[in-house]
């Protein structure tokens, strides 16, 4: 289970500040 990847995908749908720290732009 790749949590970071899941967060990144969710961020593409609904961006949030936490995503910028975890995922590349």
Curated annotation (Swiss-Prot):
GO terms for biological process: defense response to fungus; defense response to Gram-negative bacterium; defense response to Gram-positive bacterium; disruption of plasma membrane integrity in another organism; killing of cells of another organism. It is found in: Target cell membrane; Secreted. GO terms for cellular component: extracellular region; membrane; other organism cell membrane. Its main location: membrane. Disulfide bonds join 8-23, 11-19. It comes from Panurgus calcaratus (Solitary bee). This is Panurgine K. The keyword Transcription does not apply. Keywords: Antibiotic, Antimicrobial, Disulfide bond, Fungicide, Membrane, Secreted, Target cell membrane, Target membrane. Antimicrobial peptide active against Gram-positive bacteria M.luteus (MIC=1.6 uM) and B.subtilis (MIC=3.3 uM). Less active against Gram-negative bacteria E.coli (MIC=63.3 uM) and yeast C.albicans (MIC=24.2 uM). Not active against S.aureus and P.aeruginosa. Has no hemolytic activity against human erythrocytes. Probably acts by disrupting membranes of target cells.
């Amino acid at each position: 289970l790749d949590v970071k990847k899941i967060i990144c995908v969710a961020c593409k749908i609904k961006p949030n500040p936490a995503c910028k720290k975890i995922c590349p732009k």
